[in-house]
């Protein structure tokens, strides 16, 4: 059985000498893992995490892990390796995909979203883009937040809270009596022009973290690469 697709390498682990298992997030087939062999400097460069590749997967049966062959399309390593913020953001997003998506589950629209994010990240790091990535990931896994209008009154102004139950924004007037039980809605998520304060960064990460923990991170288990990104971001404002 053969699978041919374009993909992003999101994980690589050693199997034996010169042999590795790579996990690839493919455009049309979701996550696929395959065995690759490295016998040259060129092949070592091809199989780096974050590389966009032409991916060929071959196995006798679909349920087997299979062998993989890859041709490099684009490498992001040089853009990220010299910038800690970019590197930690990159490590976080690929670790989240690896953690939250199931093997061989198609996410073709999200694949395009990821490629666009990596292209933007290679140019510059934007905290707003990172949080929008996490929000998109929540939506892709079935937990979309509606931050466009108040979930009760339907007004589109003065939105400052998010309900942890409905995942909808709430206006100041509606949410005020229950503010101690609500999540804060960072202002920058409502306006592309606003400056992002340290407190708003904390609010944004607390917002996505709540829904990750409630629905997706089993037993409150955190993704280590994401925690590293959060700590670095909040401590280097």
Swiss-Prot record:
Coiled coil: none annotated. InterPro entries: ARFGAP/RecO, DNA_rep/recomb_RecO_N, NA-bd_OB-fold, RecO, RecO_C. Gene3D superfamilies: Nucleic acid-binding proteins (2.40.50.140), Recombination protein O, C-terminal domain (1.20.1440.120). GO terms for cellular component: bacterial nucleoid. Pfam families: RecO_C, RecO_N. Keywords: DNA damage, DNA recombination, DNA repair. One of its GO terms (biological process) is DNA recombination. Involved in DNA repair and RecF pathway recombination. PANTHER family: DNA REPAIR PROTEIN RECO. Belongs to the RecO family. This is DNA repair protein RecO.
